[in-house]
Amino acid sequence: MTAATENRTVRRNGPGTKRADWNNWSPLAFEEMDSALNIQQYIQQTIKANPADVATILTPPLDQDEGVWKYEHLRQFCIELNGLALLLQRECIPETCQQMTATEQWIFLCAAHKNPNECPAIDYTRHTLDGAATLLNSNKYFPSRVNIKEISISKLGSVARRVYRIFSHAFFHHRKLFDEFENETHLCKRFTTYVSKYNLMQQEHLIVPILPNQQQQQQTTVQ
């Protein structure tokens, strides 16, 4: 058995794999990743190494196509956001969160309906993540994860804006759950850094004060 074959065999979670051993394999250099999904593999490996190291996670390998890099990160954000959605189910129920809101001036309409409509926050969260998964896995817009057309890349901004609302609702209405999730994953910090780096959202829409400059600005406003 060659070393390459051994790597391909070991880097799988077989039937009956214990939780402690799940994905518990040695890291690979990006150049050694021969999978067609090497960018996803690289991103997930970097997150696993240290989820708090946002700068390293968002730094692409040399000569990496920017469109593919942005696309794969957004897919990964949506995957991880399911963890926050699961936590929110503890207390974010239609009876208490009848609308998808953040601060008092923000009420978000759900695009999953025939006509955009108000939705209970937990339903909005589910609909948004389902819609994002459908778009990002669409053969029409993303037939390849190796070469992505610019017209398809333009869709990423609308996905980013919608999924960010999940963070903002959790922060302003379920702060304890938000902090529990963020302290473990640093996902909102990574997402905010990502959309700022690639100009996928306007700064005034980034209302969760998660980055140092946002926190400083909030303190100045309060004073």
Curated annotation (Swiss-Prot):
GO cellular component: cytoplasm; Golgi cisterna membrane; perinuclear region of cytoplasm
Binding of Zn(2+), residues: 92, 97, 169, 174
A single MF term (Gene Ontology): metal ion binding
Membrane topology: Peripheral membrane protein
Annotated segments matching region Disordered: 1-23
Main localization category: cytoplasm
This protein's UniProt keywords: Cytoplasm, Golgi apparatus, Membrane, Metal-binding, Transport, Zinc
Gene3D superfamilies named in the record: MOB kinase activator
Role noted for this protein: May play a role in membrane trafficking, specifically in membrane budding reactions.
Similarity comment: family membership: Belongs to the MOB1/phocein family.
The protein's name in its UniProt record: MOB-like protein phocein
Organism per entry: Caenorhabditis elegans
